[in-house]
Amino acid sequence: MISAGDFRKGVTFVMDGHPYVVIDFQHVKPGKGAAFVRTKYKNLKTGSTREEAFNPSDKFPRAHIETKEMQYLYNDSDLYYFMDNETYEQVPLTLVEVEDAIKYLKENDSAIIKFYEGRPFQVEPPIFVELKVIETEPGVKGDTATNVTKAATVETGAIVYVPVFVNEGNIIKVDTRTGEYMSRV
């Protein structure tokens, strides 16, 4: 059990049968009245966030999250298949479970899959990925103003804003946390 007074960023807990992770917290002790913990937390299954004030003595069971590195194999209409690198077991995931991560994953790429009670609920791609630009407008010669960007579609279908000197066929490094262009490879 964990008390609300012990909440920190990244702490997982179970409330009403759903697993949550603390995104932000603030211990508040007003001049008048009892202290409380203002908490912003995210549902690990649905991804929805909420803010709520808890009494510091409120207790919750910890949510035990298991993580595994798995390899993305392929997608078959609505399902995305990942393989456990140790047991070679294949796990099918829905589009809701792979969310934004699939925009940055190519076949055979590794990803971190998070499980709660044996069920996968979230996919985390590597922090940096290298992707090939398949479609973008050609750069205009002489357009050297700083921070000029253009939209580029990469091989996974994601749209990344890149500097004007990046052309089709270039391989770029992308930060998957923000979706931003990092460099040309």
Curated annotation (Swiss-Prot):
**PROSITE patterns named in the record:** EFP (PS01275)
Give one Pfam family: Elong-fact-P_C
Sorted alphabetically, which SUPFAM superfamilies does this protein's record hold? Nucleic acid-binding proteins, Translation proteins SH3-like domain
Domain of life of the native organism: Bacteria
Signal peptide residues on this chain, from the entry's feature table: none
Keywords noted in UniProt: Cytoplasm, Elongation factor, Protein biosynthesis
What GO terms are given for molecular function?
A: translation elongation factor activity
Q: Which pathway does it operate in?
A: Protein biosynthesis; polypeptide chain elongation
Q: What is its main location?
A: cytoplasm
Entry annotated with the keyword Transmembrane helix:
no
Coiled coil feature spans: none
GO annotation, biological process: peptide biosynthetic process
GO cellular component terms? cytoplasm
Q: Where in the cell is it found?
A: Cytoplasm
In terms of NCBIfam families, this protein maps to: efp, PRK00529.1
Give the protein family. Answer: Belongs to the elongation factor P family.
Tell me, what does this protein do in biology?
A: Involved in peptide bond synthesis. Stimulates efficient translation and peptide-bond synthesis on native or reconstituted 70S ribosomes in vitro. Probably functions indirectly by altering the affinity of the ribosome for aminoacyl-tRNA, thus increasing their reactivity as acceptors for peptidyl transferase.
What is the official name of this protein in its record? Elongation factor P
